[in-house]
Curated annotation (Swiss-Prot):
GO terms for biological process: intracellular protein transport; protein targeting to ER. Residues 62-68 are extracellular. One of its GO terms (cellular component) is endoplasmic reticulum membrane. It is found in: Endoplasmic reticulum membrane. Pfam families: SecE (PF00584). Belongs to the SecE/SEC61-gamma family. This is Protein transport protein Sec61 subunit gamma. It comes from the Eukaryota. It is a single-pass membrane protein. The gene is sec61g.
Amino acid sequence: MDQVMQFVEPSRQFVKDSIRLVKRCTKPDRKEFQKVAMATAIGFAIMGFIGFFVKLIHIPINNIIVGG
């Protein structure tokens, strides 16, 4: 019986902690959501422009090396 409790107790503690975490979590209000969405959109745009410019630079270099 002691071995069973030794196996079950960590699971029980994890469930208890998880329930406590979910109860403390709150949905973001509209202003906070808009800030997070804007930051994410700006990050996507920056990464897209970086990828575009890297590809723009490497296409002519690749054509010179391979197509030469």
